[in-house]
């Protein structure tokens, strides 16, 4: 990719997971009996889990329901394991900077939108120390490779 600009947006994995729970589980009800009951029953997982249950059994929910995996998978699964591949890595809070860089490089007005914003905002402080530890373990490679950019 020499000579090319390669950009990505990164987000703190715990905050990203909380957003996934808020939007996909609470708002879209993707772990409801109606939408995922059969898959969850087959995996012996409860429908409509509370946050603690979701965190404690995250790998199982990811394996049982594709849309949860899609939104909760570690960043290394789609960004790869070499941050040096990217010429620019932007934390999600810096999308305005990314937008300005895209406009600068292309000469075209760029509009970056956040599309999945529904659901309550969940403060990371609501997680117990044990839940944070579980998530840090699940996302360990993300923190190792991309944590400095979040």
Where in this protein do the model-derived segments appear?
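PAPS-dependent sulfotransferase catalytic domain
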Residues: 1-10, 15-118, 122
């Amino acid at each position: 990719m020499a000579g090319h600009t390669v950009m990505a947006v990164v987000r703190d994995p715990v905050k990203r997971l909380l957003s996934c729970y808020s939007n996909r589980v609470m708002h879209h009800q993707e772990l409801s009996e109606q939408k995922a009951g059969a898959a969850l029953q087959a995996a012996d997982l409860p429908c409509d889990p509370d946050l603690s249950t979701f965190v404690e059994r995250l790998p199982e929910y990811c394996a049982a329901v594709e849309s949860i995996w899609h939104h909760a998978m570690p960043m290394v699964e789609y960004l790869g394991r070499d941050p040096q591949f990217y010429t620019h890595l932007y934390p999600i809070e810096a999308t305005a900077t990314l937008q300005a860089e895209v406009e600068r490089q292309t000469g075209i007005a760029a509009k970056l939108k956040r599309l999945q914003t529904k659901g309550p905002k969940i403060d990371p402080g609501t997680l117990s120390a044990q839940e944070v530890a579980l998530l840090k373990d699940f996302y360990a490679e993300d923190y190792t490779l991309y944590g400095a950019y979040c």
